């Protein structure tokens, strides 16, 4: 193998890893209304891109702090999904790593630190989630996913 150049077709999309935080408080989960070209005005769990060298737990704690100013107490892996966004202007693929977490201090309240990306945060009952849900979340909910311990 010499100095070979690999060219990726411009039509190929990107593959990213998103860490999704199912933050639980009692029987409620934290959701925000997205302000994004991807899933604008849908309700979503706090989430963000995994950075190089980061663990899933570190990413979840960092993203939650950046978006809501909340601190995680306990966190664990729940499930992983593969999500294709083929109908977008820039097709992409997201591997979504769902993590379950609880607050370090249950008295903490979420702050909307990034209003350019979220209209605000609220606590919602899992059995009565607001609509519309961001489609990757909607898909796992429709498949029977439940972030609460059994």
Swiss-Prot record:
A motif (Nudix box) lies at residues 48-69. Keywords: Cytoplasm, Hydrolase, Magnesium, Metal-binding. Expressed in petals. Little or no expression in stamens, sepals or young leaves. CDD domains: NUDIX_MTH2_Nudt15. Mg(2+) binds at residues 63, 67. Its main location: cytoplasm. SUPFAM superfamilies: Nudix. It is found in: Cytoplasm. Optimum pH is 8.0. This is Geranyl diphosphate phosphohydrolase. It comes from Rosa hybrid cultivar. The lineage of its organism: Eukaryota, Viridiplantae, Streptophyta, Embryophyta, Tracheophyta.
């Amino acid at each position: 193998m010499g100095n070979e150049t690999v060219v990726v077709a411009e039509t190929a999309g990107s593959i990213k890893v998103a860490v999704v935080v199912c933050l639980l408080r009692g029987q409620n989960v934290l959701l925000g209304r997205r302000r994004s070209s991807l899933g604008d005005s849908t309700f979503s769990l706090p989430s963000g891109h995994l950075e190089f060298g980061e663990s899933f737990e570190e990413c979840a704690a960092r993203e939650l702090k950046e978006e809501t100013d909340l601190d995680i107490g306990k966190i664990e892996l729940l499930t992983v999904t593969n999500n294709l966004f083929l109908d977008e202007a820039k097709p992409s693929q997201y591997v979504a790593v769902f993590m379950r977490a609880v607050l370090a201090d249950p008295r903490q309240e979420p702050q909307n630190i990034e209003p350019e990306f979220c209209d605000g945060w609220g606590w919602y009952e899992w059995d009565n989630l607001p609509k519309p849900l961001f489609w990757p979340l909607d898909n796992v909910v429709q498949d029977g996913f439940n972030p609460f311990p059994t």
